[in-house]
């Protein structure tokens, strides 16, 4: 007698499967409207390409005269964005041997500073006492000496009162300041608001460009003013990724763009 096989289990009806669909692309990520802003590569649009093709680059020139009055210059940009290269050009071209120049940087003895004029004083620490001494000297000599203090990535003095005075009042004592920072928030808002010239170089984060560069400074200037925010940021990244840079002359309410190769003349 052959063994009896157990009955096959009853087939359960299959649960209805939801149709598989690809996740929808967010509106700001549609083809031609999406920019991978966290990468070096930035997608473009015909509008952005047209703006770039018609941009007029200006010869680099700053409206500063240290013999007449002090100035305040800020250079913002990520690491490796040629901020120090530009600083050296400014010191050589605008602050003569008659200007007493002090450079303060944590790595002040690095090779990048080797080609600066020997007359430039150097220190690896910013000290408020130096600012006070400059002010005292010019107070006693009727503003005889033009001074300039250059601070390269001095990141821990945001709330220093004497640093703030360099932007607020000490320009009247013929004391100028040039400060280089990787983060716009590292400069106190009152100092940012009183800078004469603000220079913008490359940033790596799209949100930084949107929240600080655009919303605080550039969004209402040509070539950005008529673009939606994603395109403003993309245009900024596309230009500054080539190390071009923007100069905002606050006093004259003027924005210009400059080509990096000019700095290598």
Q: Positions of the model-derived regions?
A:
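Intrinsically disordered, low-structural-confidence terminal and linker regions
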Residues: 1-9, 32-36
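Acidic, proline-/serine-/threonine-rich low-complexity intrinsically disordered repeat tracts
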Residues: 7-29
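N-terminal pre-Walker A segment at the start of P-loop NTPase domains
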Residues: 26-62
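P-loop NTPase motor core of the ASCE superfamily
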Residues: 58-77, 86, 145, 162-167, ...
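Conserved P-loop NTPase motor cores
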Residues: 73-92, 105-109, 121-224
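AAA+/P-loop NTPase substrate/partner-engagement loops
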Residues: 96-115
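Short, conserved catalytic or adaptor-binding loops enriched in Gly and charged residues
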Residues: 113-115, 191, 238
């Amino acid at each position: 007698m052959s063994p009896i096989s157990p009955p096959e289990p009853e087939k359960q009806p299959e649960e209805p499967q939801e149709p598989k669909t690809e996740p929808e692309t967010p509106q700001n990520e549609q083809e031609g409207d999406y920019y991978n802003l966290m990468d070096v590569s930035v997608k473009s649009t015909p509008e952005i390409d047209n703006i770039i093709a018609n941009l007029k680059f200006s010869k680099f020139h700053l409206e500063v005269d240290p013999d007449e009055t002090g100035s305040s210059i800020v250079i913002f940009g990520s690491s490796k964005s040629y901020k120090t290269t530009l600083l050296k050009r400014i010191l050589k071209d605008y602050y003569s041997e008659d200007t007493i120049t002090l450079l303060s940087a944590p790595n002040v003895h690095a090779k990048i500073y080797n080609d600066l004029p020997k007359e430039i004083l150097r220190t690896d620490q910013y000290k408020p006492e130096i600012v006070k001494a400059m002010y005292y000297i010019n107070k006693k000599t009727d503003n005889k000496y033009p001074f300039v203090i250059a601070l390269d990535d001095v990141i821990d003095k945001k709330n220093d009162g004497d640093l703030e005075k360099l932007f607020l009042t000490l320009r009247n004592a013929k004391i100028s300041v040039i400060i280089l920072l990787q983060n716009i928030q590292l400069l106190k808002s009152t100092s940012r608001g009183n800078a004469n010239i603000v220079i913008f170089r490359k940033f790596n984060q799209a949100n930084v460009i949107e929240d600080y560069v655009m919303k605080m400074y550039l969004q209402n200037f040509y070539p950005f003013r008529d673009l939606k925010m994603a395109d403003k940021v993309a245009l900024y990244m596309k230009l500054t990724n080539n190390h071009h840079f923007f100069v905002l002359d606050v006093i004259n309410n003027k924005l210009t763009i400059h080509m990096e190769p000019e700095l290598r003349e």
